[in-house]
Amino acid sequence: MADEKNQQAAAPAAANAGTVTLERVSNPPAQTWNRLRANDITLTVPSISRKGDVHFALPQLFSKIECGMGQKVTDWVCSQAADSRYVEVPRGTRREEPIVVSVSADEGQVADTGVMVREGASATIVVAASGQGQAGTCASLLRVVAEARSHVTIVEVLGVAEGQQHLESLGVSAADDARVEVRQYALGGGTLALGSAIDLAGDRARADLTCRYHARRKDVLDINHVVRQRGRNTRAEVSESGALDDAARKTLRATIDLVHGARGSKGNEAESVLVLGDDVVNKTMPVILCDEDDVAGNHGATIGSVSPEQIDYLMDRGLSRREAEQLFVRAIFEDAIMHAPEEASHRAAVLRAEEVLGADVAHDFDGGAGLPEGGEAAC
């Protein structure tokens, strides 16, 4: 279809671009003390003039969707993307091939994508971000409308090189009886900033969001998750888990907002953090907002290291302490590689696993030979 053609082009070289600072983006609905420095992130990103370009804009409906990194990032992506891409999944159909958004920090690619999943339809959307160079920024803005009784699966596999950064902003609006599944794999790099906002606007809508992450050395990982439960009898399940090594810095803001009128709704959020480095900085801000009586909301976070008993058990079987700890990191990458639904996301996970774990280990669980070919790619 014409409206599904690849509209994205690589950005000009960084040498031809200026920069702009996005101040205090990826804010949560309710903030904590500023002195904790957990409310937002400030990013310096390329700024390329698109003056004179003819730009295809998404339908106006998409501009009303809240996105996880906020309006400043949305405006920046729209100004930097060579074009916007619109995909529509017809009513009552099941789209077999995934809708793929693939961006590279090496090429400075920025993607603006809108997906309309019509009533009773189902689709899988994949975002893959990768990079192997010394510097560069890539970004993806994905906005999804899930109509009544639709089923949307979103898989994000994100990993760039140490001197690079990636911005990932997601916004989803779900109508009556719609189901949204989001699986995120944040596999590290210089700076990874991702925000997700899911609006359960319809009755009995459901969202399941799972995020697995790894950061090491001096990586910066910033995550903002927001689920707004507006319809009656909605369900939200949010789960984050990961490992932090060396001097990595991670901030997570996770908010479940039980809006007035969301009677009978339930929301749960939980995070588990494994700390492997002495200089790790971990900040977690789980929040439940409630403006309705007949609702249930739960949240929590646990942080710890590998127990001495587990270390002793593994060392008795011939592993060093470091090798024993790396088993937990390996499990994150194995999950990402094994569950990548197509070639671009699989490649992004393998490239990052090779960098972190080594090529031999990365390919121990590389089952990519049977992957379907690409789908509707965006690069």
Give the predicted meaning of each segment.
Residues 63-319, 333, 337-379:
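Conserved beta-strand/loop scaffold segments within soluble protein domains that form the structured core
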